[in-house]
Amino acid sequence: MKDVLERFLGYIKVDTQSSEESDTVPTTKTQLEFAKKLGEELKAIGLKDVSVDENGYVMATLESNIDKKVPTIGFIAHMDTSPDLSGTNINPRIVEKYDGQDIVLNKEKNIILKINEFPEILEYKGQDIVVTDGNTLLGADDKAGIAEIITAVEYLINHPEIKHGTIKVGFTPDEEVGKGADHFDVKKFGADLAYTLDGGGIGELECETFNAAKAKVIIEGRNVHPGSAKNKMTNAVLVANKFINMLPENEVPERTEGYEGFFHLLSVKSEVETAELNYIIRDFDRKKFEERKEQIKEVGKKINEKYNKEIVCVKVEDQYYNMKEKIDEVKYVVDIAHDAMKAIDIEPILVPIRGGTDGSRLSFMGLPTPNLFAGGHNFHGRFEFVPVLSMEKAAELVVKIAELYANR
């Protein structure tokens, strides 16, 4: 599985950030260009039925090498990187045999990956770790997953003694902006079940996600010359501040963990005449999720009552739901992944995803899709890193899962 690092380093050279602002599919042209390159690579290693559609979805098939009928399994990763930080000119560095100390990512800018802030890195002492130069994210989310899947299926092609059923490979665009499953053709994909490789540290096995929604708050102010503004001006900046402060201050990402939900203020655009707040709303519990959506709407209503006019408009849109209810119907998909990890000396860590994957929506589209680790940490930022061994073990896990299904 040594090819996984070389593949990964090649993939992150391509800037495939998705965009919240774009209405195109995919949201950025570079994703489609990258999809075409991946399609060519899949053909080159010997996969069949390789397709890259106009929306940037890549699909391919590794044909079964056994006579008996077993479930067709899919392995899925996403091609885009987060728009939260630049993915242009990623300049990775391999820290060989990590010594357990702080890692200076950028001496000139004094950007340091500190063990007291990111203690999880100590779990990889003695291993080779890929880090950034402090200027960009790394792109392990989710190009590590792509590299692992392709490396695994190539290994199966080159080792026909390992028996497996039909395997489907899928790569999606725009996962980071919540659109990864929008145009995914489940019927065309043709899998009975699937796994995304979009998780974090080694051993993570996830079958629960948030219920997720986004909220856009538009505030209409009224600008009047400040010298004569008394009882006339409505300052949208101050109304926005009031709105923000009316939501629970401790129910935010930086103060929650585990199964706790939150309101996350993504952006504020504000001036006297108008303001716009963009939130995401998250909770594992469906009832609490619905209550959160009503809560943010209620804030808008209370402000409108105070001003005795409609100056606040709150629009809420669901994004995805907790896939647990669908995964529980086919629990064996989690059990096999669990057993496969044990078989290759990985201790499974069953954790809820404090986020979402393409599998969240695919599970509700008829394709049960739990999530496996891809190996990275600190996604979406300059402190992102991925241990090389974790990527190699993820590729090995894909092979072992395929093998276990063939032996069921």
UniProtKB/Swiss-Prot annotation:
Zn(2+) 1 binds at residues 78, 141, 198. CDD domains: M20_peptT (cd03892). PROSITE patterns: ARGE_DAPE_CPG2_1, ARGE_DAPE_CPG2_2. It is found in: Cytoplasm. Its EC number is 3.4.11.4. One of its GO terms (biological process) is proteolysis. Zn(2+) 2 binds at residues 141, 176, 380. Keywords: Aminopeptidase, Cytoplasm, Hydrolase, Metal-binding, Metalloprotease, Protease, Zinc. Its cofactor is Zn(2+). This is Peptidase T. It comes from Clostridium botulinum (strain Loch Maree / Type A3). The gene is pepT.
